[in-house]
Amino acid sequence: MLKSKTADFDSKQKLSIALNHAYGMKVSYGLTGYGRQVALDIRFQYIRPERVKDPDYIHEVVHMMDQILHHALFDQKSFEEAKYLLASRLRRQNDDPDSLALKMAFALAAEDHDIAIPIQGALEDIEALSYEEVVALYESWRALPRFVSCCGTLEPVMEAFLNAIPQFEKPSLRMALIPRTSPSFQVLEKNIAQTSIVQVWATSTPIDSSRYYPLLVLNSILGQGPMSLLFEEVREKTSLSYSISSSLVRFDGALLISTGTSADSIARCLRLIQAQIQKCADGQFSDEQLEIAKMDLIDMFRRQQDRPWAMIEQLFLDSMLERSESLAQRVETIRTIERDQVCEVASRLALVSMAIVKEDFDETMEN
């Protein structure tokens, strides 16, 4: 609803025309989970004023930002439209086996943990939502202080506008790692072309721990890097999977392994996945794999210096974690990671949930 209309631009068309008139000014919105908090970020991107031969241009940009941040226009019609679009998106996600398996695995991982709460909501909650609740939430949100950051050169008028926004010194951080529990399993059969498997492994490694950078290296070696064990052993050598990778849910202390395979290959895939984790715990990876994983991470942090949004996101994370590392310090920390540090974090992994959305082969479809 925030992106629909404002007091001065009371239709989607008027708002779109105004953004285009401001030399294609861009606005985007996003929700991101950080442990027990959810951040709503609003991003603005505009051309540097010295490149525009219009003395009023920067004032036009500031006016657009003020309208979007402080004067969003809500009504029952836009509420019903937003509600319909969100519900439709969630239904499409439930029809996608990868998204469905991920949602199921999170729900199984820890029923009372934040990881089990879908950030985009649940269909039953959306259907029960009222217009009055959304308006009340918006008014509460408007009163909250913000975390404001920018990448680029600020003109005095823009700097004055941003400084007038109530801000907090640093974002708060509330997080709890998913507990190590006996694993939970769920299998759902659907009329689909391939099986999707999502496993959630507890890492027992908080993001502000000294073990966090070794965990990043482990994730690269295991399933995220270009020479990952999962890719080489499960997909390339045995052709048991169509896709396989690992990723981290940093603030919840979770490592995900996502696999696309066939129903008759499930058991063999799972055995091989377990074997690769054990390899990491036992240090059975090459020096080359270790160095490539470290260089990939270093390159990722260096590439951030060329990407404004990545720089802002890193600043936000560092502010939350009260971390003041320079790029050089971060690079040096990664370079000095040893094999035994990677083995240690691998040995801490514990499977807590697994969801399988399995193809239900119907012979009548083939005939």
Q: Model-predicted segments: where are they?
A:
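His/Glu-based metal-binding/catalytic segments typifying zinc-dependent metallopeptidases
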Residues: M1, A128, K170-L229
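A broad, low-specificity signal for short, low-complexity segments enriched in glycine/proline
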Residues: M1-A7, A105-H113, A160-A164, P179-S182, ...
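Short alpha-helix boundary/capping segments
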Residues: K3, A7, K53, Y57, ...
